[in-house]
């Protein structure tokens, strides 16, 4: 496991190479990630870093949160995230330390995790790419219906996990092996090739690619 950072999706643009090729990129803002807690085998049973980033209005911070951040001596952020550590990883990182985008300076590919855009309640055609039924030939009301969802007496039920209508999107999604195009440490920006999950301003978890 490699240490990751929390970023914010700014949007998409494109950059041009020296030979004129256009590369679509997603711009991710990675402000300073502050270490709020260091978990150890002795106290917690596993090794991890608990980090926060961004800011939060004072009247939105609960008393337990305020005490937790005050104990760590860091400014309250918009959330708390945990990064598991492998043996020997993260040595020397203490509570109150700041992690910045420059840790990706020597990383070629990253995995980006975020929450996909929510689509609400959708039918099988949009949610699962089902084909539509006949437009004519006697079909009056079932143009976008799912169709058969099972058998009669045997097994006499609908199998679990059957693809049907339901809530679509708003799920945790990871896009793997995205090329790192540019690291702008001065402006706290990371540019990766292609699209990443979620809407603009959504929180993202960026880690060095596990399959690189």
From Swiss-Prot:
One of its GO terms (molecular function) is rRNA binding. InterPro entries: Ribosomal_uL3, Ribosomal_uL3_bac/org-type, Ribosomal_uL3_CS, Transl_B-barrel_sf. GO terms for biological process: translation. Methylated by PrmB. It holds the Pfam family Ribosomal_L3. GO terms for cellular component: cytosolic large ribosomal subunit. Belongs to the universal ribosomal protein uL3 family. One of the primary rRNA binding proteins, it binds directly near the 3'-end of the 23S rRNA, where it nucleates assembly of the 50S subunit. The modification N5-methylglutamine is found at residue 153. This is Large ribosomal subunit protein uL3. It comes from Shewanella loihica (strain ATCC BAA-1088 / PV-4). Part of the 50S ribosomal subunit. Forms a cluster with proteins L14 and L19. Keywords: Methylation, Ribonucleoprotein, Ribosomal protein, RNA-binding, rRNA-binding.
């Amino acid at each position: 496991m490699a240490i990751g950072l929390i970023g914010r999706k700014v949007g998409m643009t494109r950059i041009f190479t020296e030979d004129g090729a256009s590369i679509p990129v997603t711009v991710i803002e990675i402000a300073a990630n502050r270490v709020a807690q260091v978990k150890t085998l002795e106290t917690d049973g596993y090794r991890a870093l608990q980090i926060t980033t961004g800011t939060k209005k004072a009247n939105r911070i609960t008393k337990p949160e305020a005490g937790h951040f005050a104990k760590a001596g860091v400014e309250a952020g918009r959330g708390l995230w945990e990064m598991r550590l492998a043996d020997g990883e993260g040595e020397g990182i203490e509570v109150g330390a700041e992690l910045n985008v420059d840790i990706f300076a020597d990383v070629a590919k990253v995995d980006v995790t975020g929450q996909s855009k929510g689509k609400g309640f959708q039918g099988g055609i949009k949610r699962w790419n089902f084909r539509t039924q006949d437009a004519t030939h006697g079909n009056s009301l079932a143009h976008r219906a799912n169709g058969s969802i099972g058998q009669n007496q045997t097994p006499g039920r609908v199998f679990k996990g059957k693809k049907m209508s339901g809530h679509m999107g708003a799920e945790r999604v990871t896009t793997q092996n995205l090329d790192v195009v540019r690291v702008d440490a001065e402006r706290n920006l990371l540019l990766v090739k292609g699209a990443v999950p979620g809407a603009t301003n959504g929180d993202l978890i960026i880690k060095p690619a596990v399959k690189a």
